[in-house]
Regions:
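Intrinsic-disorder/coil detector with helix-boundary
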Residues: 1-176
Length: 176
């Protein structure tokens, strides 16, 4: 699956980087409880779904090539290059939820669940669950279009979408 997502700034993720979900979990799963003062809080119960092991090995092998440099060239060729040089590619755990986040504190709190958490989006957990249920390898690759903060806008949607589609197309071409 391709598209866009939010990156976790505290992990060094930047706009226009590329996120590949090594695993996914639903950050909204757990039990909603009440504090003594009556306020609600979530007792999280994350269920992590990993990327298919064979696919993970192929991704790691592919990332050893100069794929980041090639992707940057493709961005420049299509007049989509962002101000930074070569985008970083993060193959790391992702979090998935049912709402769009524009809150720096919430984004930082995700690191309490997994210190390597790097991406936040809305479809990956369902994709990975379906893949595991059907015994079909699947992969989530998304461009970082925002950092889940109040500066969120649509400015990087096109670049993020292009990068994720370019990566998946070239990865599949490489392994088949």
């Amino acid at each position: 699956m391709t598209g866009i997502c939010a990156g976790i700034k505290d992990r060094g993720i930047e706009l226009c980087d590329l996120f590949i979900a090594e695993s996914e979990y639903d950050y909204g799963s757990g039990k909603l409880a009440k504090n003594q003062d009556g306020s609600s809080f979530l007792k999280p119960e994350p269920k992590v779904i990993p990327c298919d092991y064979t696919l993970k090995t192929k991704i790691n092998d592919y990332l050893r090539s100069d794929v980041d440099v090639s992707m940057f060239s493709a961005l420049k060729d299509n007049n989509l290059a962002f101000g930074k040089n070569v985008p970083s590619i993060h193959f790391a755990p992702g979090a998935c939820g049912s709402y769009v986040i524009a809150n720096e504190d919430f984004m930082s709190s995700l690191l309490a669940t997994n210190r390597k958490m790097s991406g936040l989006e809305m479809e990956g957990y369902g994709l990975y669950v379906a893949g595991h249920m059907l015994n079909k390898p699947c992969l989530l690759v998304k461009g970082i279009a925002d950092l889940g903060d109040t500066a969120k806008d649509d400015k990087f949607h096109t670049i993020g979408s292009f990068m994720s589609a370019w990566f998946v197309y070239n990865f599949l071409k490489n392994i088949y």
